[in-house]
Amino acid sequence: MTAAVFFGCAFIAFGPALALYVFTIATEPLRIIFLIAGAFFWLVSLLISSLVWFMARVIIDNKDGPTQKYLLIFGTFVSVYIQEMFRFAYYRLLKKASEGLKSINPGETAPSMRLLAYVSGLGFGIMSGVFSFVNTLSDSLGPGTVGIHGDSPQFFLYSAFMTLVIILLHVFWGIVFFDGCEKKKWGILLIVLLTHLLVSAQTFISSYYGINLASAFIILVLMGTWAFLAAGGSCRSLKLCLLCQDKDFLLYNQRSR
């Protein structure tokens, strides 16, 4: 039973991200490098936010329950803010690298910023999902474990779906964020930051897992639609994708008529 819970939750949380990696990134060495770099940037942001939280905890030096809760909220907000700052820093690094590649070799085709946004977002998401869920996932292997004592028996399942949402949201946030940077629409960056804060702070607002998960999925659908449009998607391109028909195939059919 515990093995089934472990593998089931693991595939729910990381299955889509693994599929995205295998089918869209694994065949391109350069994309793998950008993915690892994005994951590294997220790790550095986590390290800095952890140091800030630890310093705040040492300065306050109060172990009361309410104080610890406020420290946790403070740490969450600081972590989200630093993550988005590092997302912007990674964008600037990729932009400079792309411009440098064009100046050195004008004939070389640099990867598009939309592609880099997707790859970096997936790197952010995978690393975020691993750090947020791996401890919970390891607890599911405990002898006779169905849930955590005093909590919902569906805790592991909710956590798996929430990890899935966070990973995909990081992909969508990355695409929308880079698009806002490219167009110099700084309000878009603020929206990404606010939605990130909202999803991260849901557990402080409500203790009902079902409500938190439903609202997170709503944000996921909205951000996914926005990212699809920002990446140049349309109803026509979506239809062609679903029907497995590319542009050359359509032009050939039109010419034959």
From Swiss-Prot:
GO MF, one annotated term: protein-macromolecule adaptor activity
Keywords linked to the UniProt accession: Membrane, Notch signaling pathway, Transmembrane, Transmembrane helix
Cellular compartment(s): Membrane
Membrane topology: Multi-pass membrane protein
Disulphide bond pairs: none
Pfam families in UniProt: Aph-1 (PF06105)
Chief location bin: membrane
Record bears the keyword ATP-binding: no
InterPro entries attached to this UniProt entry: Aph-1
GO biological process: amyloid-beta formation; Notch receptor processing; Notch signaling pathway; protein processing
UniProt KW Membrane keyword: yes
One CC-aspect GO term: transport vesicle
Transmembrane segments: 5-25, 32-52, 70-90, 115-135, 158-178, 186-206, 213-233
Highest taxon listed in the record's lineage: Eukaryota
Complex formation: Probable component of the gamma-secretase complex, a complex composed of a presenilin homodimer (PSEN1 or PSEN2), nicastrin (NCSTN), APH1 (APH1A or APH1B) and PEN2. Such minimal complex is sufficient for secretase activity, although other components may exist. Interacts with PSEN1 and PSEN2.
Similarity comment text for this entry: Belongs to the APH-1 family.
Function recorded in the entry: Probable subunit of the gamma-secretase complex, an endoprotease complex that catalyzes the intramembrane cleavage of integral proteins such as Notch receptors and APP (amyloid-beta precursor protein). It probably represents a stabilizing cofactor for the presenilin homodimer that promotes the formation of a stable complex. Probably present in a minority of gamma-secretase complexes compared to APH1A.
The name this protein goes by in its record: Gamma-secretase subunit APH-1B
Annotated organism of origin: Pongo abelii
Higher taxonomy: Eukaryota, Metazoa, Chordata, Craniata, Vertebrata
